[in-house]
């Protein structure tokens, strides 16, 4: 089978491309830069439709990610890729099966997320990323795609989640907002496995994460130790964290830079978010990797 992977030069797309090649599939990497394996076809998601000639399956990993300064510029930049780029891809797919990698950031943060099913409301997003991913996946679902919703993807090559966390250490201390909570995380290998299994699933949305949630403070402490950091974890009262985030976002609006702290970042760490994996498990998918596996496999 010939599998097109968009965003193959990126973190998630690169893992999907390598996994597809390892499974014996011919890989076509779509993006501005070549991926780690297979044929490269240039594609700028914000400008034109992709060349899908000869392709049997499309796995759409390309996305504008991050937590930019609030405002029209960030909204437009993310919409150009996550929404308009999705529309271009779906038109080019012309009925081919599509696996669309979304995010648990589409879920409404104002509702309880102690156990989140795929039917959880998708509204009240805290940044442009959540809003545009929700709008993009709505197009994909309407087109009959399989949509995967991972949360907090980590693993080899991660440039977002753990690097951002480690960069927040100051004076030997890492401040975390609010109390200790349970959080779902997603090993990139588990996501890649789901991407390659998903073509056999019924169209619709599926949560994807590691097999069990993690206690936040213990997981963060393990990450710090594995990276040689002796930083201590201290808890910042949630109202204080939210107030600081609001002030940082206001400053970022003026400078056009990413806020030092955002309400989205606070929300991701301060409230329990556990994904219900029942729907994906019912399809025969089982997550095989854990945070401990990743941390123990890192070079000393």
Segments and roles (model prediction):
Residues 87-128:
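Conserved Rossmann-fold NAD(P)-dependent oxidoreductase catalytic core, especially the SDR/UDP-sugar
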Residues 146-164:
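Flexible, glycine-rich beta-alpha linker
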Residues 275-300:
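Amphipathic terminal alpha-helices
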Residues 3-23:
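N-terminal Rossmann NAD(P)H-binding glycine-rich loop of SDR-like oxidoreductase domains
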Residues 124-146:
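Active-site Tyr-X1-5-Lys
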């Amino acid at each position: 089978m010939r599998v097109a992977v968009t965003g193959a030069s990126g973190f998630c797309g690169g893992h999907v491309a390598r996994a597809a090649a390892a499974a014996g599939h011919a890989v076509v990497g779509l993006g501005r830069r070549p991926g780690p394996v297979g044929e490269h076809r240039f594609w700028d998601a914000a400008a034109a439709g992709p060349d899908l000639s000869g392709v049997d399956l499309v796995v759409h990993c390309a996305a504008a990610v991050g937590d930019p300064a609030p405002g029209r510029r960030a909204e437009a930049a993310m919409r150009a890729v996550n929404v308009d780029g999705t529309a271009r891809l779906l038109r080019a797919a012309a009925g081919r099966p599509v696996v669309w990698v979304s995010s648990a950031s589409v879920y409404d943060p104002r509702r309880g997320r102690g156990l989140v099913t795929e039917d959880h409301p998708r509204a009240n997003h805290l940044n442009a990323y959540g809003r545009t991913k929700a709008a993009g996946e709505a197009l994909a679902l309407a087109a009959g795609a399989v949509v995967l919703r991972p949360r907090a993807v980590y693993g080899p090559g991660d440039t977002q989640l753990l690097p951002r966390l480690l960069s927040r250490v100051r004076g030997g201390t890492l401040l975390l907002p609010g109390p200790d909570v349970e959080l779902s995380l997603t090993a990139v290998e588990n996501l890649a496995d789901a991407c390659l299994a998903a073509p056999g699933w019924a169209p619709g949305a599926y949560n994807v994460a590691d097999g069990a949630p993690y206690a936040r403070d213990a997981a963060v402490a393990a990450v710090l130790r594995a990276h040689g950091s002796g930083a201590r974890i201290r808890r910042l009262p949630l109202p204080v964290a939210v107030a600081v985030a609001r002030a940082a976002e206001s400053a970022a609006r003026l400078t056009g830079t990413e806020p030092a702290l955002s309400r989205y970042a606070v929300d991701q760490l301060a409230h329990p978010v556990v994904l219900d994996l029942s729907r994906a498990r019912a399809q025969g998918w089982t997550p095989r990797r854990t945070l401990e596996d990743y941390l123990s496999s890192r070079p000393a």
